[in-house]
């Protein structure tokens, strides 16, 4: 069964030009909430966020829907560059 981090990695790496440079980490925030941190190279940031943030919004929607199926109440997604 695919976990939240693996699912997020699958989605983001399928978008990126260089999938080996993508890192995904998960942190507990509260009892029922998690923080997913997606770390991408600077040159991939525009591709991951998309025009007007549409790709980032779609990623957030898919990840939150997946988390809901795993009985997680709230998931926050951060996208950072290095």
Task: For the regions a language model picked out, list residue spans one by one.
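RNA-contacting regions in translation and RNA-metabolism proteins
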Residues: 1-47, 55-82
């Amino acid at each position: 069964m695919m976990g939240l981090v693996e699912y997020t990695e699958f989605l983001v790496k399928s978008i990126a030009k260089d999938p080996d440079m993508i890192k995904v980490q998960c942190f507990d925030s509260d009892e029922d909430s998690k923080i997913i941190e997606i770390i991408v190279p600077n040159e991939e940031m525009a591709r991951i966020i998309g025009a007007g943030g549409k790709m980032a919004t779609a990623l957030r929607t898919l990840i939150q829907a997946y988390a809901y199926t795993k009985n997680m109440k709230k998931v926050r997604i951060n996208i950072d560059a290095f």
